[in-house]
Amino acid sequence: MTSIVEALVPGGKANPGPPLGPALGPLGVNIKEVVEKINEKTRDYNGMQVPVKVIVDDKKNVEIEVGTPPTASLVMKELGIQKGSGNAGSEVVGNLTIPQVAKIARMKKEDVLSYDLKATMKEVMGTCVPMGVNVEGMKAKDCQKALDEGKFDDLLANEAW
């Protein structure tokens, strides 16, 4: 029978204590090894709570699935802000650079329907609109158009998907 343990853990800093240790102990798996794998997979989400699913089959094989925090949370973390703007049309709370948008897009890669970096970056920029966050000093919608027009192709040349 397969057992599933779901928990919210601090990115890159999970430990064998609660909630993981007590849940994994009865399943007979190497808790330290599982925690190390979780920390490796969640390293990019340092300082954020990350949803993790640990799947253990009858032969004690362990599979770890890591979810990603919401895009808005990743944007706020990148900017170092607590919340978005209450007046998105008139109040700007931060400005992302194209490399920062690309970093967030790579983090969301597994959770989006887009097939390439540019399309996922446009999704991230779409999240910036109601938050009052600009990208490269311009409104996020304008930056999406600039991205489509190839304005940032030179910056993205070294960005891996």
UniProtKB/Swiss-Prot annotation:
InterPro entries: Ribosomal_uL11, Ribosomal_uL11_C, Ribosomal_uL11_C_sf, Ribosomal_uL11_N, Ribosomal_uL11_N_sf. The keyword RNA-binding applies. One of its GO terms (cellular component) is large ribosomal subunit. The keyword NADP does not apply. GO terms for molecular function: large ribosomal subunit rRNA binding; structural constituent of ribosome. CDD domains: Ribosomal_L11. GO terms for biological process: translation. Keywords: Ribonucleoprotein, Ribosomal protein, RNA-binding, rRNA-binding. It holds the Pfam family Ribosomal_L11_N. HAMAP family: Ribosomal_uL11. Belongs to the universal ribosomal protein uL11 family. Forms part of the ribosomal stalk which helps the ribosome interact with GTP-bound translation factors. Part of the ribosomal stalk of the 50S ribosomal subunit. Interacts with L10 and the large rRNA to form the base of the stalk. L10 forms an elongated spine to which L12 dimers bind in a sequential fashion forming a multimeric L10(L12)X complex. This is Large ribosomal subunit protein uL11. It comes from Methanosarcina mazei (strain ATCC BAA-159 / DSM 3647 / Goe1 / Go1 / JCM 11833 / OCM 88) (Methanosarcina frisia). The gene is rpl11.
